Design a protein with these regions (language model features):
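Amphipathic alpha-helical scaffolding segments comprising HEAT/armadillo-like alpha-solenoid repeats
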Residues: 2-6, 28-42, 61-77, 98-110, ...
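Short inter-helical turns and helix N-cap capping residues of alpha-solenoid HEAT/ARM repeat scaffolds
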Residues: 44-45, 81-82, 112-113
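Short, mixed-charge aromatic SLiMs
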Residues: 76-84
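Structural detector for internal amphipathic alpha-helices that build alpha-solenoid repeat scaffolds
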Residues: 8-29, 47-65, 84-98, 118-132
Length: 137
């Protein structure tokens, strides 16, 4: 566990310092790193969360299976104390755009924070609309 915690922290620190392209290459070369997406979106540093979204946007098409497996860990952040992290997690689930996120989002639809509720509702609508449009996900 110590090794994986250190690796996640190293990735988060690189993300905060703007080394997104290096992180993208790391994820391409080691698919096990996708397990860190949940921890990265839960990071208190906004640059880390923003970088996590950019990372997923960049890798979504090629690595959707690996990213989809991280949905439960990402969804844990829908219960974070910080409402900004909850909203960012909802947004990231929308970027992933996979139907497996819908049960987690449905549980968060009555969040106490109006911005989180709005993010959750928009993400549910987006995933549902796109799923109906293409008949998959």
């Amino acid at each position: 566990m110590g090794q994986s915690t250190e690796t996640k922290e190293m990735i988060a620190d690189y993300m905060e310092n703007g080394f997104l392209n290096d992180i993208i290459d790391m994820f391409k070369n080691d698919r096990r790193l996708f397990t860190f997406l949940g921890g990265l979106i839960a990071d208190e540093r906004s640059r880390v969360r923003l970088g996590t979204v950019a990372l997923v946007e960049e890798l979504r098409e090629m690595y959707i299976n690996e990213i989809a497996r991280a949905i439960p860990d990402i969804a844990e952040s829908l219960n974070a104390v910080n409402p900004i992290i909850r909203a960012d997690a909802a947004y990231l689930l929308g970027v992933i755009n996979h139907k497996n996120a819908l049960p987690y989002l449905s549980k968060a639809v009555n969040d106490e924070n109006p911005l989180v509720r709005e993010a959750v509702e928009e993400t549910i609508a987006f995933i549902s609309d796109l799923s109906e449009e293409i008949g998959t996900n």
